[in-house]
């Protein structure tokens, strides 16, 4: 950690010494409705990139210590037209009038599930411009990598294909993701498979990341974080964009976007087509990803209707297996022992011994691929019932279907419900074969919210939703060297998962005084989950589970001064186990629902060239389902309940306008993530059963105690930006034993990004972008897993997912 803090401070000192101080200004005024003259509390007033405030109960605001180079104030309020006021002509004490939007704004759709400075919760907003700077083909987890407390992972090692995300150490199954307020997480696994939505960032208008329990939302409740995405962006004028990028590992992205603008003063149509492809850093880990986005909107004076459809289709060569520790370290003796322990055949043994230490891929069959298509249909509506009340009603259908194909060497016929083959006097019980494991599902439902704004002290929302997931899981044998009595596409397992989810919530903000406001939020959520049939291990699965949860939240926000605020919140979240928690559990030990009590407290200050915030959190868990470090045969993590555990830490964020040319954004998380008393169960093949090992208090797996992100930008002219992006992630244990021999080592990476914006006569804008990732070629892994057993002694197998060394991406965006 010392080297990263020294490095970041050196950067700051280098650019800061001798730079001139800019003059400071104060701006104050009142925001009102242009027709009624009603003050607008909670309006946002921004001055430049880092400074901003919200109006108090009487619509008044004060901004102090604003640098002299801030040219305008920007005022926004949901349902109103944005106003920009030149600072050169601004008089303190002025009244700024906002006009109601002629059209119901798209932003009201996500307003009920988002938070703001009055909520008392930790959050980060990421706009379309910030995403566009980084978007050269890598997935959304990689684009969000420099937000606080976030760690991204990539199976293929280059940010394309299967990627993952953890926030505060919590994995993707606990991170609630919504698109336009509609749940996106897979209801059974609770995970998010970003590979199914390639280049979705090109259609996103904004992302809000809420850390902790967050506000009540739709779908499986957040149990560590929420990623709230909106695609509904209103374009008044027609537009077209073409983006192409190319880079290392034959990575390329091609995107075409277009929109009609406002037709007949009522209608808009927006569309996008994308292709993303890469050979991957890992051997054979290629991806071929295609997607589209199509949206049609009707904008009336009181009503808004938008139909969205988008789809992603992926063909990805599997790299789920990871690389054995001995291969990563180049330990030949260790590899030979691994080959012997795991019974690798000659082909697989030679692949292990002769592959590059960092690009090894266990799979060699030429069609060992994941093939999946996911189609989304959303009907998003909003109607203004009165000047104070808005009703939003949405409906959605998600259709998913696909399979992954695997070559199996010398597998038992009985594993596929096939009898032995008799040839003469010879009995054949094993065969080489190719199997496909299918998912075929529908996910559909509705969400709603009724939003009330008194334009005085009270703002409130009542909302909720229901949804149903109906998914078939089945496996087929499509080829076998000895086919027994099977027919083509012989089905060897089949089960169905039916999950229903309903929730109802109520939220309110109340402005007690000019300085003090409060937030309250209560939610009731009910879940039923039924699985029937046999799974891919030929185990009969027959369970019917129901859960009812009550999730209250409260928060306070107090304005200490014109420039600073303090806040605190307390939230309770509950969550049901996912599919694998049930199917991988023993009959004696069934998974239980988890409970999280989340305390957040923080401080925000903005003064002149500096913006700073500090957030403390204490996440106290009961029966937390923690990752054991083991994965199943498709790379999904296995979890187990632990009675008592917690995560506590402090998140620091800062932004500094060092001069007109230099800007620095940085964030750091320092945390402790502990299980009160962890017992490890090790399979004992020598004696049967398990050996129990009590480790006492341990660290939670995959939870680094230190995460640091930095973006240092140099802007020599208004059209050119050069940014150094730095990320430090501390040690992560692969399981919950705190064993130093089972961990991912800390790593520090540096990326360099260049952007040059041109405005030729034939185009609105031409953007030339270049990104050099890992410029110092840090040797590191971002993910891994482990498992152990006893067979002639204790054996522990560690696997890692190595990431690429220095690599680059170059792109050109044309806007018309």
Place the predicted regions along the sequence by residue:
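Short, acidic, small-residue-rich periplasmic hinge/interaction motif at the N-terminus
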Residues: 32-36, 43-46, 74-80, 90-133, ...
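Short acidic/polar hinge/loop motifs at secondary-structure boundaries
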Residues: 62-64, 183-211, 230, 327
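A beta-strand signature from Gram-negative outer-membrane beta-barrel systems
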Residues: 96, 198-241, 253
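Extracytoplasmic beta-strand/coil segments of soluble accessory domains associated
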Residues: 141-183, 205
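Transmembrane beta-barrel wall of Gram-negative outer-membrane proteins
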Residues: 239, 246-277, 282-321, 326-330, ...
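Membrane-embedded beta-barrel scaffold of Gram-negative outer-membrane proteins
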Residues: 388-396, 557-559, 565-571, 592-648, ...
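Gram-negative outer-membrane beta-barrel transporters
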Residues: 514, 618-620, 640-736
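C-terminal beta-signal and adjacent terminal beta-strands/loops
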Residues: 664-667, 672-674, 728-733, 756-816
């Amino acid at each position: 950690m010392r080297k990263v803090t020294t490095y970041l401070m050196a950067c700051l000192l280098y650019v800061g010494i001798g730079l001139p101080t800019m003059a400071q200004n104060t701006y104050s005024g009142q925001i009102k409705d242009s027709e009624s003259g009603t003050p607008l509390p909670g309006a946002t007033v921004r001055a430049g990139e880092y400074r901003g405030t919200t109006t108090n109960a009487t619509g008044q605001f004060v901004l102090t210590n604003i640098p002299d180079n801030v040219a305008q104030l920007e005022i926004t309020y949901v349902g109103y037209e944005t106003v920009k006021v030149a600072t050169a002509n601004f008089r303190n004490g002025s009244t700024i009038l906002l006009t109601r939007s002629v059209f119901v704004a798209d932003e009201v759709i996500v307003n009920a599930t988002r938070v703001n400075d009055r909520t008392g919760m930790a959050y980060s907003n990421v706009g379309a411009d910030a995403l566009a700077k980084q978007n050269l083909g890598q997935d959304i987890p990689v684009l969000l990598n420099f937000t606080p407390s976030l760690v991204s992972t990539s199976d293929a090692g280059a940010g394309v294909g299967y990627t993952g995300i953890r926030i505060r150490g919590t994995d993707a199954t606990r991170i609630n993701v919504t698109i336009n307020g509609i749940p996106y997480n897979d209801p059974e696994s609770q995970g998010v498979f970003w590979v199914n939505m390639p280049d979705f960032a090109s259609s996103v208008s904004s992302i809000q990341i809420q850390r902790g329990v967050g506000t009540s939302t739709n779908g499986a409740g957040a149990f560590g974080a929420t990623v709230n995405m909106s695609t509904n962006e209103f374009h008044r004028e027609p537009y077209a964009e073409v983006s192409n990028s190319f880079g290392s590992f034959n990575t390329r992205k091609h995107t075409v976007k277009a929109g009609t603008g406002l037709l007949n003063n009522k209608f808009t149509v927006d569309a996008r087509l994308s292709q993303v492809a890469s050979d991957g850093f890992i051997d054979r880990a290629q991806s071929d990803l295609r997607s589209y986005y199509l949206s049609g909107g009707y904008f009336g004076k009181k009503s808004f209707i938008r139909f969205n459809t988008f789809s992603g289709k992926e063909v990805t060569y599997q790299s789920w297996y990871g690389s054995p520790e001995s291969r990563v370290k180049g330990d030949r003796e260790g590899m030979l022992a691994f080959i012997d322990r795991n019974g690798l055949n000659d082909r697989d043994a030679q692949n292990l011994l002769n592959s590059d230490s960092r690009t090894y891929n266990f799979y060699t069959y030429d069609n060992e691929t994941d093939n999946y298509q996911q189609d989304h249909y959303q009907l998003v509506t909003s109607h203004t019932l009165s000047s104070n009340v808005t009703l939003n009603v949405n409906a959605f259908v998600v259709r998913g279907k696909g399979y992954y194909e695997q070559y199996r060497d010398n597998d038992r016929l009985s594993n596929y419900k096939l009898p032995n083959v008799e040839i003469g006097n010879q009995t054949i019980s094993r065969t080489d074969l190719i199997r496909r494991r299918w998912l075929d599902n529908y996910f559909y439902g509705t969400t709603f919210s009724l939003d009330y704004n008194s334009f005085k002290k009270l703002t409130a929302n009542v909302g909720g939703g229901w949804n149903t997931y109906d998914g078939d899981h089945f496996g087929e044998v499509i080829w076998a060297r000895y086919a027994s009595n099977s027919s083509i596409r012989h089905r060897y397992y089949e089960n169905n998962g039916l999950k229903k989810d309903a929730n109802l919530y109520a939220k309110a903000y109340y402005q007690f005084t000019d300085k003090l406001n409060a937030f309250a939020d209560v939610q009731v959520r009910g879940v039923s989950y039924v699985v029937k049939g046999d799974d891919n291990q030929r185990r009969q699965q027959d369970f019917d589970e129901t859960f009812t949860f009550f999730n209250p939240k409260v928060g306070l926000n107090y304005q200490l001064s014109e420039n600073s605020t303090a806040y605190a919140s307390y939230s309770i979240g509950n969550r049901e186990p996912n599919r694998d928690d049930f199917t991988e559990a023993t009959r004696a030990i069934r998974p239980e629902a988890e409970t999280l009590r989340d305390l957040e407290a923080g401080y925000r200050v903005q003064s002149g060239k500096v913006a700073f915030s500090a957030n403390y959190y204490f996440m106290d868990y009961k029966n937390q389902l923690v990752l054991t470090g083991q994965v199943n045969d498709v790379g999904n993590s296995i979890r187990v309940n632990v009675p008592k555990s917690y995560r506590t830490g402090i998140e620091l964020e800062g932004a500094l306008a060092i001069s007109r040319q230099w800007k620095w954004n940085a964030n750091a998380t320092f945390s402790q993530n502990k299980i009160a008393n962890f017992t490890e169960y090790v399979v004992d093949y020598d004696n049967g059963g398990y050996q129990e090992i009590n480790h006492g208090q341990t660290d939670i797996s995959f939870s680094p105690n230190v995460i640091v992100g930095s973006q240092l930008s140099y802007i020599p002219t208004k059209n050119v930006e050069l940014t150094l992006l730095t990320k430090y992630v501390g040690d992560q244990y692969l399981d919950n034993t705190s064993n130093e021999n089972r961990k991912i080592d800390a790593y520090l990476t540096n990326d360099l990004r260049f952007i040059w914006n041109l405005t030729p006569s034939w185009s609105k804008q031409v953007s030339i972008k270049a990104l050099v990732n890992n410029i110092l070629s840090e040797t590191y892994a971002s993910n891994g897993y482990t498992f152990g057993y006893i067979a002639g002694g204790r054996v522990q197998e560690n696997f890692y997912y190595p990431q690429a060394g220095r690599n680059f991406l170059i792109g050109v965006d044309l806007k018309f």
